[in-house]
């Protein structure tokens, strides 16, 4: 007995839905033993469907898992698969036919070895006739469709109904009709079997078909391998492990503010002009110093989460993010609360050079109590958020300076607009250590110092 499988992907990751449908009927009568394949119901509410492309033609053998025909509904296009062997003897509904009622005959199948030519003149009437799609109960019944067909001179015996279990799958999800060797070769060579025409029995793709496709499309094969696997360095593995740990273990929260740096830039220019080349201060040097002052005023931020305790540090050791050819590293400027701007600037430059040259000592990058990551050298970066450097509890992310129009009130009472240099900074805090109000207080102290930069000189 020939048993079909209907398959359909109802959802992207849907499990197989099992159904039982009386879609096969076994007939004997004046024709050789055969099976009538009927239009299946793909859902409880389906009353009719359309016939898509037939994947087999009369005389073709059907093997387990092969698609016989596509069934179309108003929502999807389904494959009609079989799980046992048989031969297609007659197609009763051609491709493109619409509104074929559920239960109406669509094809005839026979066992292998049966004379298919015996079904050349086989008609729908021979298969038991067809009915119209079910009519809703509130509509009058059409008497013409309810009348029985003219009985045949020799009544056929009662059909043997066969139920089956099956599953549904969209046609797009269909596995290519290919021999195992062809599938293996296609997988090795990166060939998409959906683009290969089969020359084997029933359109099955052979190994030779895959070889021909490979020879005729060298460009496609080259495009499929257009990438390079870069070995992961030890440093990259360390960065990945630490940042993954931080995101997983530290509940981040973020506080942002706009810093007016117009006064700071004027002070920086004045100090650099009077330095006679002894130093050249950067905005980052001022920010590092300001972080030291803010962290002494709000010491909770200058802490780290340890097993059983929160460790609060006496000195503010700022880890400065430096990009190197091998990845990001954070050398430490220690005790910034007690250092002057010139000393901080010299330490940052020396540590950054060592970092790029790969000459940092472990004690120069291991530890630290708080971090800063500055992308201000890139004018495209207005703001960003940074991941906390564990086991620290805070990191400051610094964007590029932006000219912002701000309203001003003149001495004569009139109003106008002036341009102000501003930087957006965003602090990331570990909520295990720092509460929201504490983080906001730290940002307020940082803003106060930066916008009144003479405090940095005290």
UniProtKB/Swiss-Prot annotation:
GO biological process, one term: pyruvate decarboxylation to acetyl-CoA
E.C. numbers: 2.3.1.12
Classification via InterPro entries: 2-oxoA_DH_lipoyl-BS, 2-oxoacid_DH_actylTfrase, Biotin_lipoyl, CAT-like_dom_sf, E2/Pdx1, E3-bd_dom_sf, LAT1, PSBD
Origin: domain of life: Eukaryota
GO terms for cellular component: mitochondrial matrix; pyruvate dehydrogenase complex
Record lineage: Eukaryota, Fungi, Dikarya, Ascomycota, Pezizomycotina
Protein name: Dihydrolipoyllysine-residue acetyltransferase component of pyruvate dehydrogenase complex, mitochondrial
Further remark: The E2 component contains covalently-bound lipoyl cofactors and it participates in the generation of acetyl groups from hydroxyethyl-thiamine pyrophosphate-E1 and their transfer to coenzyme A.
Transit peptide feature range: 1-28
Cofactor(s) needed for function: (R)-lipoate
NCBIfam families: PDHac_trf_mito
Annotated cofactor note: Binds 1 lipoyl cofactor covalently.
Keywords recorded for this protein, A-Z: Acyltransferase, Lipoyl, Mitochondrion, Transferase, Transit peptide
Function as written in the Swiss-Prot or TrEMBL entry: The pyruvate dehydrogenase complex catalyzes the overall conversion of pyruvate to acetyl-CoA and CO(2). It contains multiple copies of three enzymatic components: pyruvate dehydrogenase (E1), dihydrolipoamide acetyltransferase (E2) and lipoamide dehydrogenase (E3).
Record-annotated Lipoyl-binding domain positions: 34-110
Compartments in which it is found: Mitochondrion matrix
Species of provenance: Neurospora crassa (strain ATCC 24698 / 74-OR23-1A / CBS 708.71 / DSM 1257 / FGSC 987)
Matches recorded under Gene3D superfamilies: 2.40.50.100, Chloramphenicol acetyltransferase-like domain, E3-binding domain
Pfam family, one: E3_binding
Catalytic-site annotation from UniProt: 431, 435
Catalytic activity: N(6)-[(R)-dihydrolipoyl]-L-lysyl-[protein] + acetyl-CoA = N(6)-[(R)-S(8)-acetyldihydrolipoyl]-L-lysyl-[protein] + CoA
MF-aspect GO terms: dihydrolipoyllysine-residue acetyltransferase activity
Record-stated family: Belongs to the 2-oxoacid dehydrogenase family.
Annotated region described as Disordered, given as residue ranges: 126-164
């Amino acid at each position: 007995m020939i048993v079909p499988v209907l398959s359909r992907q109802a959802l992207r990751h849907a499990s197989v839905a099992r159904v039982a449908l009386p879609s096969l009927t076994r007939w004997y009568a004046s024709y050789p033993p055969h099976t009538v394949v009927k239009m299946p119901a793909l859902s409880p509410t389906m009353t009719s469907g359309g016939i898509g492309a037939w994947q087999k033609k009369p005389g073709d053998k059907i093997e387990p898992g092969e698609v016989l025909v596509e069934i179309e509904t108003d929502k999807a296009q389904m494959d009609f698969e079989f799980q046992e062997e048989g031969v297609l003897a007659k197609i009763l509904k051609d491709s493109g036919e619409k509104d074929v009622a559920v239960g109406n005959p669509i094809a005839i199948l026979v066992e292998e070895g049966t004379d298919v030519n015996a079904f050349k003149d086989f008609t729908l009437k021979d298969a038991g006739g067809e009915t119209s799609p079910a009519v809703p109960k509130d509509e009058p019944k059409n008497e013409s469709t309810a009348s029985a067909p003219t009985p045949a001179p020799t009544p056929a015996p009662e059909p043997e109904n066969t139920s089956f279990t099956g599953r549904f799958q969209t046609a797009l999800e269909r596995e290519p009709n290919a021999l195992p060797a062809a599938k293996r070769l296609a997988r090795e060579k990166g060939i998409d079997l959906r683009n290969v025409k089969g020359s084997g029995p029933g359109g099955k793709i052979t190994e030779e078909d895959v070889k021909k496709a490979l020879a005729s499309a060298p460009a496609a094969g080259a495009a499929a391998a257009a990438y390079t696997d870069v070995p992961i360095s030890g440093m990259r593995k360390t960065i990945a492990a630490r940042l993954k740990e931080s995101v997983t273990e530290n509940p981040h929260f973020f506080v942002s503010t706009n810093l007016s740096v117009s006064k700071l830039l004027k002070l920086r220019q004045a100090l650099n002009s009077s330095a006679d080349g002894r130093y050249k201060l950067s905005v980052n040097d001022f920010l590092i110093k300001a972080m030291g002052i803010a962290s002494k005023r709000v010491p909770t931020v200058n802490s780290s989460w340890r097993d059983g305790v929160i460790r609060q540090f006496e000195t503010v050791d700022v880890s400065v993010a430096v990009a190197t050819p091998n990845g990001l590293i954070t050398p430490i400027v220690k005790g910034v609360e007690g250092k002057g701007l010139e000393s901080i600037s010299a330490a940052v430059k020396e540590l950054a050079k060592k970092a790029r040259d790969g000459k940092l000592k472990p004690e120069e990058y291991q530890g630290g109590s708080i971090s800063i990551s500055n992308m201000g050298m890139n004018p495209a970066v207005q703001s960003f958020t940074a991941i906390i450097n564990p086991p620290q509890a805070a990191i400051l992310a610094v964007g590029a300076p932006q000219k912002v129009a701000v309203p001003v009130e003149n001495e004569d009472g009139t109003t106008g607009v002036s341009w102000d240099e501003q930087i957006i900074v965003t602090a990331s805090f570990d909520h295990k250590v720092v509460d929201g109000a504490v983080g906001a207080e730290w940002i307020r102290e940082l803003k106060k110092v930066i916008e009144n930069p003479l405090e940095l000189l005290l």
